[in-house]
Regions:
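Thiol/selenol-based redox catalytic cores and closely related redox-interacting motifs
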Residues: 90-164
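N-terminal "domain-start" segment that seeds a small globular fold
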Residues: 1-22
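Structural microenvironment flanking redox-active thiols in thiol-disulfide oxidoreductases
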Residues: 45-98
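A short, polar/charged loop-to-alpha-helix boundary motif
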Residues: 163-176
């Protein structure tokens, strides 16, 4: 089985953390590459991961969320301490490159207008009054998701083809 790539990372408050050390804290780790904190779609996903995190823990799984946001940006968010999982700050995009998580070729290529999930998320954004914040990183960055066992085996990977092409919590739970 293919091994997940190990890396050092920083959070809003800590530097020099090791991914392999974090992975050993649970049977399975959901490594999610999102865009940045100012992105409303990413905000919506973050809220869902937080609300449903107990389901991951019931499976002895954890989330490690990678954002292009800086530690300073995360520290400015008053609710950052309430996020129940690790949020990795990668403003230079080094981890995106390490895991070959690419960006869309153009802003239009980021969206699939025929994707029901896109429209469902757009409606949810409006209902929750989520607004676009500061731009950070590569604006055309696409998300990705990897499932990693406690011994660093990479047993599932998903590279998004559009901004809304990321597995739902229900889909992730089934894969665990």
């Amino acid at each position: 089985m293919k091994k997940a790539l190990d890396f050092q990372y920083q959070t809003a408050y800590e530097e020099g953390k090791q991914f392999s050390d974090k992975v050993r804290e649970a049977d399975k780790t959901v490594l999610i590459f999102s865009r940045y904190l100012g992105c409303p779609f990413c905000q919506l996903d973050l809220l869902e991961y937080c609300a449903e995190y107990h389901r991951f823990r019931e499976k002895n799984a954890q989330i490690v969320l990678v954002l292009q946001s800086s530690p300073e940006t995360l520290r400015q968010q008053t609710l950052i301490e309430q996020i129940p999982f690790e949020v990795v700050c990668d403003p230079k995009g080094d981890l995106y490159q390490l895991y070959d998580v690419s960006a869309a070729s153009s802003p239009l290529a980021m969206i699939n207008p025929f994707d029901r999930k896109l429209w469902k998320k757009a409606i949810s954004l409006l209902k929750r009054h989520l607004k676009h914040g500061s731009y950070e990183g590569n604006e055309q960055q696409l998300p990705a998701l990897f499932l990693v066992s406690h011994n660093m085996d990479l047993f599932h990977s998903h590279y998004a083809k559009s901004i809304s092409d990321i597995p739902s919590v229900d889909q992730i739970i089934k894969l665990l």
